[in-house]
Curated annotation (Swiss-Prot):
Oligomer status and interactors: Homodimer or homotetramer.
PROSITE patterns assigned to the protein according to its UniProt record, in alphabetical order: PABS_1, PABS_2
Keyword set includes Cytoplasm: yes
One Gene Ontology biological process: spermidine biosynthetic process
InterPro entries the UniProt entry points to: PABS, PABS_CS, SAM-dependent_MTases_sf, Spermi_synthase, Spermidine_synt_N, Spermidine_synt_N_sf
Enzyme Commission number(s): 2.5.1.16
Active site residues per record: 158
Protein source organism: Escherichia coli O6:H1 (strain CFT073 / ATCC 700928 / UPEC)
Residues holding spermidine: 64, 88, 158-161
A cellular component annotation (GO) from this entry: cytosol
Catalytic activity: S-adenosyl 3-(methylsulfanyl)propylamine + putrescine = S-methyl-5'-thioadenosine + spermidine + H(+)
Protein name (Swiss-Prot/TrEMBL): Polyamine aminopropyltransferase
Length: 288
């Protein structure tokens, strides 16, 4: 039997992960990027950009449930939601499950990403692009949040790692723009990497966000594809009570929402804000 090809991730220099490649569905390598989608028996369809896994069919639900349901249920009455990035459609899919949300705006810098993911990752969006509340804006995220006249109750930054095109979504200009178009009491969240290996990302985001929001922190989830420990999500708001809601309050909102989840539940919600001591110490040691 012929040995299967292997695809090796190149995110870290000293160690990493690999996937056996059952079938390459798409591969484009240009001077600007290397994009591949392949099938793997354990994780289904896998999409990687420039040597870094972006999403897989098998475990994407963990990431997307935690990025959406935590801020939306903590807020309690969000009507207008902004997604920055999210071209694969899975973040949109989870937001559309909240029936009280009235509008969902998604800002994607490349229209081709949306059509590409609709073709190769159809399970991610699961038809959510057809939701009447959804509006797609093709624009740079930093430009949009600093120019739009719209305001939002929850902003979700589904950014890649802070390298290449994704770097702008970790800048002060982006965070300031998000504060500008966030309604009073609103919540901003963003993926912030695996803190054991990418601790400087969390420290940098915490320092920058603290210039614009009075309550800045992180919550976490364990996502197999993003190996090396827990993945952290940045959390920023001016209503510090929202990060400390009881499990009972979240439970009541969860039951009222009618949501059925595979990872998220109210106990996971409240526990997610408990951070390992090494991260707490690193954040506390930074100058104010």
């Amino acid at each position: 039997m012929a040995e299967k090809k292997q695809w090796h991730e190149t995110l870290h220099d000293q160690f990493g992960q690999y996937f056996a490649v059952d079938n390459v569905l798409y591969h484009e390598k240009t001077d600007h990027q290397d994009l591949i989608i392949f099938e793997n028996a354990a994780f289904g369809r896998v999409m990687a950009l420039d040597g870094v896994v972006q999403t897989t069919e098998r475990d994407e639900f963990i990431y997307h449930e935690m990025m959406t349901h935590v801020p939306l249920l903590a807020h309690g009455h969000a009507k207008h939601v902004l997604i920055i990035g999210g071209g694969d459609g899975a973040m949109l899919r989870e937001v559309t499950r909240h029936k009280n949300v009235e509008s969902i705006t998604m800002v994607e810098i490349d229209a081709g990403v949306v059509s590409f993911c609709r073709q190769y990752l159809p399970n991610h969006n699961a038809g959510s692009y057809d939701d009447p509340r959804f509006k797609l804006v093709i624009d740079d995220g930093v430009n949009f949040v600093n120019q739009t006249s719209q305001t939002f109750d929850v902003i979700i930054s589904d950014c890649t790692d802070p390298i290449g095109p994704g770097e702008s979504l970790f800048t002060s200009a982006f965070y300031e723009g998000c504060k500008r178009c966030l309604n009073p009491g609103g919540i901003f969240v963003a993926q912030n990497g695996v803190c054991f290996l990418q601790q400087e990302e969390a420290i940098d985001s915490h320092r920058k966000l603290s210039h614009y929001f009075s309550d800045v922190g992180f919550y976490q989830a364990a996502i197999p594809t993003y190996y090396g420990g827990i993945m952290t999500f940045a959390w920023a708001t001016d209503n510090d009570a929202l990060r400390h809601l009881s499990t009972e309050i979240i439970q009541a909102r969860f039951l009222a929402s009618g949501l059925k989840c595979r990872y998220y539940n109210p106990a996971v919600h409240t526990a997610a804000f408990a951070l390992p001591q090494y991260l707490q110490d690193a954040l506390a040691s930074q100058p104010s």
